[in-house]
Design a protein with these regions (language model features):
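Interfacial transmembrane-helix boundary/kink motif in multi-pass membrane proteins
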Residues: 2-16, 50-81, 132, 138
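Alpha-helical transmembrane segments in multi-pass membrane proteins
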Residues: 5-51
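Hydrophobic alpha-helical transmembrane segments
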Residues: 9-13, 65-69, 105-109, 137-142, ...
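Aromatic-anchored segments of alpha-helical transmembrane domains
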Residues: 16-25, 72-79, 144-152, 187-197
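Functionally important transmembrane alpha-helices
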Residues: 23-28, 158-200
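Membrane-embedded alpha-helical segments of multi-pass membrane proteins
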Residues: 34-44, 105, 109, 160-168, ...
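Juxtamembrane helix-loop-helix connectors linking adjacent transmembrane helices
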Residues: 54-115
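Function-critical hydrophobic alpha-helical transmembrane segments in multi-pass membrane proteins
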Residues: 96-152
Length: 200
């Protein structure tokens, strides 16, 4: 399941550089959408230049499409159960306030598309497949915990939706070996949350 065949430490250094660029693009996209998209694209191009093969851009198979649909439905179902017993996470309350002053197209790009691409490349791609490429289960655990911890919550239980989402993304990624699959699941999850916040 290796995505880079070169020296481990050189690959790690390249991955760190690309991660910084992607995260800068992520942050910049909140206020300057075109600059943010451009920076993220630079990060994706650098993946190819440094031969870190996280994205294949091949046509999805039917089984991968089923994983996308199933993964999105599973997360939606778990979110529904969570919200039945707990309040809306702080992170989504913050998003709700931001959306009041943002055009729809900008909301979709900055809340649904860019986070899905950047977070999956960084958390599932870089952490699982680069940092822990010989210890994938440890990578799955670490990536899920870091992914959850970087989202905002006032309570421990508030991190739960991000934790189980991270685990599901990681498991499906390891099963399908296609980062595009979990990017699409993540995008669908973000988009559905966005639409519910806007019109729910």
């Amino acid at each position: 399941l290796s995505v880079a065949r070169g020296n481990y430490f050189l690959t790690l250094l390249s991955a760190f550089l690309i991660t910084i660029i992607l995260l800068i693009g992520f942050v910049v996209s909140d206020t300057h959408i075109l600059y943010g998209v451009f920076i993220v694209l630079i990060g994706i191009v650098l993946l190819r230049l440094f031969k870190i093969n996280l994205l294949s851009f091949k046509k999805l198979t039917m089984s991968q499409v089923i994983y996308i649909i199933g993964g999105a439905l599973l997360i939606y179902g778990l979110d529904y159960l969570y919200l039945h017993f707990h309040d809306v996470p702080t992170n989504e309350q913050e998003l709700d306030r931001e959306l009041q002053h943002m055009p729809l197209y900008m909301s979709i790009v900055t809340i649904a598309i860019i986070p899905a691409i950047v977070e999956e490349i960084v958390f599932r791609g870089m952490i699982i497949r680069v940092v822990f490429r010989k210890h994938l289960f440890i990578g799955l655990v670490v990536s899920s915990l870091v992914f959850a911890s970087l989202h905002e919550s006032d309570t421990w239980i508030g991190y739960l939706p991000y934790l189980y989402s991270g685990v599901i993304f990681g498991l499906i990624y390891l099963k399908t070996k296609r980062l595009e699959v979990v990017i699409l699941i993540h995008f669908i999850n973000n988009l559905s949350s966005l639409l519910i916040l806007l019109w729910g």
